[in-house]
Design a protein with these regions (language model features):
Chain B
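N-terminal helix-turn-helix DNA-binding core of bacterial DNA-binding proteins
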Residues: 1-37
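Short, hydrophobic-biased segments on the C-terminal half of alpha helices
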Residues: 42-46
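Beta-hairpin "wing" of winged helix-turn-helix
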Residues: 48-62
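Basic, amphipathic "hinge/linker" alpha-helix immediately C-terminal to the N-terminal HTH DNA-binding motif
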Residues: 60-83
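Amphipathic alpha-helical dimerization/coiled-coil segments
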Residues: 77-106
Length: 199, 106
């Protein structure tokens, strides 16, 4: 298949990412086991056409990220200060949004838009609670960030100056947090080279 | 061992040929489970000594060794027992009243 090596490398990258979250003593074995299945999926003659095999392989690799949190022995590693600060910022923003939107409803109970915003901000708090209970939520975070940006931009377009303040609150820290997240995920981290060598 | 749907499907897949070594991908297809569900489940079954695992020796040079799983003797016994009990429970459970077919009475 064209681009097979690249696909395999991408799959391995996802599996490696998943294994980074496992304890050191079982990390290497899991990486070897999971990465060894990638070529088998990519060459499975029972699955046709070839692009569908590639999709299946990538889904397999991506789902190991979810699996590591359920694997016995998995422990949440020590959290960085940036991650703690990011969470704190989200909590403050969520609570401020709930308070402000509830206040807005109390001020203008007849406007349907005012009901939409408190519901949305409660969802924001629900997401943060879920993230605390279940740590696998990067994709949800990205989806939520996208919807947040859309909603804030839509609100800012309405011309209310208070919405510009909220837009600034979200627009300024979010690119920084996203960049930090990307750096953490994409850049070499402790244990990664050992995994690459062993794979 | 708590008999959930995924556990039942994995045990059924193993019991279709208890002596055969099963790879992760092979089990994924047989049990129709994603990797994120299957591997943690296999790890738990292995901890409970119901499943054993070993690394295969690659047949060709450059091939990666794959890890395969097999039910232990105790695993076969417990799997058969648990699956039989699950099947009996399903038969005992009262059937849900379905929606009446169009045109029928009731």
């Amino acid at each position: 298949m064209r681009g097979e090596r690249r696909l395999l490398r991408l799959g391995e990258c996802l599996v490696r990412q998943a294994c980074r979250r496992l304890p050191q003593e079982i990390r290497e074995e899991h990486y070897r086991e999971w990465a060894a299945e990638l070529p088998a999926i990519l060459h499975d003659p029972q699955v046709r056409p070839a692009p569908w095999r590639a999709v299946r392989m990538l889904v397999y690799a991506a789902d190991t990220l979810r699996g590591t949190a359920l694997t016995p022995g998995w422990v949440r590693g020590p959290r960085s200060r940036l991650s703690v600060a990011g969470d704190l910022l989200f909590w403050v923003a969520a609570l401020v949004l709930v308070a402000f939107n509830s206040w807005s409803v109390a001020q203008a109970p007849g406007d349907w838009q005012e009901y939409l915003l408190p519901a949305w901000s409660v969802l924001f708090v629900a997401y943060l609670i879920r993230k605390r209970v279940h740590p696998v939520g990067r994709m949800t975070a990205l989806l939520y960030t996208g919807s947040t940006l859309t909603l804030v931009a839509w609100n800012a377009a309405q011309g209310n100056w208070l919405n510009y303040v909220f837009a600034a609150l979200v627009f300024i820290p979010l690119p920084i947090l996203l960049l930090a997240w990307w750096l953490r995920v994409a850049m070499p981290a402790r244990g990664r080279h050992a995994l690459r060598d062993s794979g | 061992m708590r008999m959930t749907g995924p556990v039942e499907r994995v045990l059924t897949a193993f019991l279709s040929d208890p002596a055969a070594p099963r790879y992760g991908y092979d089990l994924m297809k047989a049990a129709r489970l994603p990797s994120g569900t299957l591997y943690p489940l296999l790890a738990r079954l292995e901890q409970q000594k119901l499943v054993g695992s070993a690394w295969e020796t690659p047949q060709q040079e450059g091939e990666r060794p794959r890890k395969y799983y097999r039910l232990t003797g105790e695993g076969v016994r417990i799997a058969r027992l648990e699956l039989a009990q699950a099947s009996a429970r399903r038969q005992r459970a009262p059937a849900r009243p379905g929606r009446p077919a169009p045109g029928s009475l009731g």
